[in-house]
Amino acid sequence: MTAVNPLDHAEEIKQLFVADERPEFVPFFDRAYAAGVQAGGGSWVGRDSDGHIVMHLACFPRRFRFGERDVVGGLMRDALVARPYRSFFPAHALIKRATEDTRALGRMDFVYTNPNRHAKAVMDLCGFAQVGTLERYVLPVGHRRWIVDRPIGLVHAGVRWVRGGATLVPRAASEFSAVEFASPPGDSPRLRPYHNAAQYLARLEGYPAAADWWFTLKENGAGAAGLLVRGPDSSGLADLYAVRRDPRLPLARLISGLAVAVRANRCTRLQVWTLAESLFATEVRRSGFVPRQEAAPLVATALTPSGQAVLHAAHLWEITSLDCDH
């Protein structure tokens, strides 16, 4: 197992994924890996007796604000072992080496990821523990049939009136700079991510695309909230990828305003992924979102005392799928 700069082995790594019928990795590599390496990330590879890459794992840093301090999490992603070598011991050695190398560098406080069932079994034996469960939540905001859509619209209008729903301004992502929402605003005890343009470009293919919209709220002349939505797609489904807000703003107030805004764009359902055990998920549910069956474990291991504090505070995580490998 060797730590490498993935940019120096780009074609070999891409070929490993293509051979495993994961061609979507190639454009992701092209748009995400240079920024990941520049931020301090890297890859680990394993080779066969002929020197060909047959295993790969990457880890990229993600900055968070946790109460009054900054912490850095390492997002492990793109783990793959070629089929002839797909057994417990090679995968265990790869994950163990990557974790220990990351610990030795001293740049990150914890490492986290959302593995599939088989990878989780290996990670459990590498010192990773389950922090919680990433769960999908869906908010019905409309319907293609007017006889169903009309009552839904009346419900959202009523909820907005009762909650004092915010009037959000829609801004095409292609014409809007989200720099003012890069840092978590205000003071909060929660774990909240920093975001930058490179993360949006990496996570959302084609960003800023025609379907990418920021819905913003200003109070006292400053940006109080920004919500990033992609969609709706042809089925009417839109994704809520980022919630950047002053901690004093109730999520329900923002969502009631957002529901009315996305209805105007023929959205029928709005979905978001977050940690089910968190206070943020409680706010999501109280805003009208309904949990669905889709879920995935989120596991992590601490590298520093600050990282240990983060892992013991699952209820304080305020993340979405934008912050995970999901």
Name what the model sees in each region:
Residues 41, 104-108, 212, 264-269:
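Short, high-confidence coil segments that cap the C-terminus of an alpha-helix
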